[in-house]
Amino acid sequence: MIFIYLLVQTAESSWLSKTYKKLENSAKKRISEGIAIAIQGGPRRRRFVVQQDTISPRLEVDERFLPNSVQEQI
């Protein structure tokens, strides 16, 4: 039964083909939006990036185990 279904399905109407086209169109849209924003000179929009000032450190650092370069940055 599944074999017959696969034979009847054309490559153009398969689920995988449709999903690939949706992903491809989405990527093209994001790229074109980024180019348009760059041309207009506006700020870049970032997806799923949390602002740095909203992140609070939850770890306490023991400075004895840090390399010198890291201690200088702290």
UniProtKB/Swiss-Prot annotation:
Residues excised as propeptide: 45-74
UniProtKB keywords: Antibiotic, Antimicrobial, Secreted, Signal
Induction: By bacterial infection.
Cleaved signal peptide residues: 1-13
Main location: secreted
Known function: Has antibacterial activity against several Gram-positive and Gram-negative bacteria. Is weakly active against yeasts. Acts by a nonpore mechanism.
Record's protein name: Cecropin-P2
Annotated source species: Ascaris suum (Pig roundworm)
Gene: ASCEC-2
